[in-house]
Amino acid sequence: EAGIAAGVACVMTSYNRINGEWAGQSKEVITDLLRGELGFEGLVMTDWNSVYDMQKLILSGQNVEMPGSWKEDITAQELLSQGKITEADIDAMIRPLIATCIRFGLYDRKGDEKYKPELLAKLPEHEAAAYRTSSEGIVLLRNDGLLPLKPGTKILAAGQFLDEIPRGAGSAAVKGYNNVTLRQALEEQFGARVTFAEKPSKEQFAAADVVLISVGTLDAESIERPFALPSSAEKLVQQAVGANPRTVVLVNSGSGIRMTGWADKAAAILYGWYPGQNGFRAIAKVLAGELNPSG
């Protein structure tokens, strides 16, 4: 209700049943409650593969089935020819879709125009919001006096996400723009004091002032991943903490992980979640003591 009052343009229905009917094809939910009682006039769309009856779908007040028809055994055209729906029902389904496109100027956009100028002007504002969000979410799970790093400390960095932005899969697989990798963020913050190794030796680990190990998971909807880290990441952490007690483990994940066997051996553990486009900059500043990990 608060979202509608704020002018939200689109509502997605859920996967569950409400009063015995699937939410995405429920006239009670979409027409009576959402459009009637709450006064929503925008676009309504299904979640992916969440409706099962084309006639109910059309008569419910739904506008878009995503990602397309999958379970229905009859088309809208067939329903129309059988008299089970009318052209007015189709018009009612299409009208909010077209109105939403007009509202956001989609029909005014040129075919090769990726971003409208007024949207491009807002990118710095959006980047600042992304940085602030990541900054306020970082959690310091453990710190045995190592952080913040002392001036002049040299860092050996290794692990999964030096050059990749960790993110979820499915609807969480948002690539973003102007992404800053962990490698770039560390180089910006520490310059020549940070070195990188793809497969560090035991001797390299032991010789470093501080070791930073980047690990994490790629979480996804509808998939139950193992609670443990990927085996290669788990092995790398074990090697690092075994060779150098001054090891910082940076975890980027969308949920919890098993840390048994190394949590009490690492000097510090940072939980950075999925960092987005600017989150690694925030993590670098936490390491340097310029930002408080207050998540």
Briefly describe each language-model feature range.
Residues 7, 61, 244-246:
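Glycine-centered short loops/turns at secondary-structure junctions
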Residues 28:
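Catalytic core of the metallo-beta-lactamase
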Residues 9-10, 63, 267:
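Short acidic/polar active-site loop segments enriched in Thr and Asp
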Residues 13-23, 31-134, 212, 250:
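Active-site or pore-adjacent capping/gating segments
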Residues 2-6:
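Alpha/beta enzyme core
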Residues 1, 20-25, 39, 45-54, ...:
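C-terminal non-catalytic regions of proteins with extracellular/luminal or membrane-system context
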Residues 8, 66, 105, 109, ...:
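Residue-level signal for secondary-structure boundary elements
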